[in-house]
Amino acid sequence: MKVRLHYKKSRFFLSWQSTFVLLGTILLAAVAAFGADSATVIFSLDFPNSDPEHYSISVQSDGHAKYESSGKVSKDSEDDESYQSEFTLSNATRARIFDLASQSHYFSGKVDSGNKKLAFTGAKKLVYKDGQHDTSAEYNYSSQPTVQQLTALFQSMAGTLEFGRRLTYYHRYQKLGLADELKRMESEARAGELAELQSVKTILQQIYDDQSVMKVVRAHAKMIMDMGDSGSH
């Protein structure tokens, strides 16, 4: 009986040991698969003496995005200030970005037009990273339609996020500046010049909920929020 009991315990131990090994193998395989499927597209622009002078947008294949910029937040600012914001892209925009990156051969070839006669519109850079690629391209202007579309999309997103940056500043330090800023934002949104309005919903909601802000200003904030929720921009 003692021998049998010992044998059963050993077999039980080995069974659990095998289970842990199997689970570990499955977990490692899942992590490897996630790494293989995970991809990132980054767009950055550096344009001295503009506002902002620098910004970058990093987009992951799961839709998570991060925006960083530096520049003067208002005309009264003496020094450049850095700004960061994290948000989730709409499924449509996320899919479009990675589709355009694929059509652009993940920026592995020549992207810049090479035309030195064109005006300088900022040093732009596109980066693509996944399990099989780590490629990038720098350009002032590209004649490739897919790169042009990506550039326009990222610039429209940056326009929205810079409105968010300024609205955050005005709401905290200069509420009288909110009216003109929101009017301009609504006008540009209706003209199709802004993208991913939901990325700045937090500050718009804060303005709308602030009873110390004029009703007409809060109404503009609500209007822009509704436009973002409807996915019209």
Language-model features and meaning:
Residues 1-16:
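N-terminal secretory signal peptides that target proteins for export/translocation
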Residues 18-30:
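Bacterial N-terminal signal peptides
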Residues 34-49, 110-233:
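Short, well-ordered, aromatic-rich surface patches in folded extracellular/luminal domains
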Residues 38-40, 52-54, 60-62, 92, ...:
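Extracytoplasmic
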Residues 45-71:
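N-terminal targeting signals for Sec/Tat export/insertion, comprising classic cleavable signal peptides
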Residues 62, 88-96, 128-134:
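A short, structured loop/turn motif at beta-sheet edges
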Residues 65-79, 156-166:
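A short, surface-exposed interaction/processing loop segment used at functional sites
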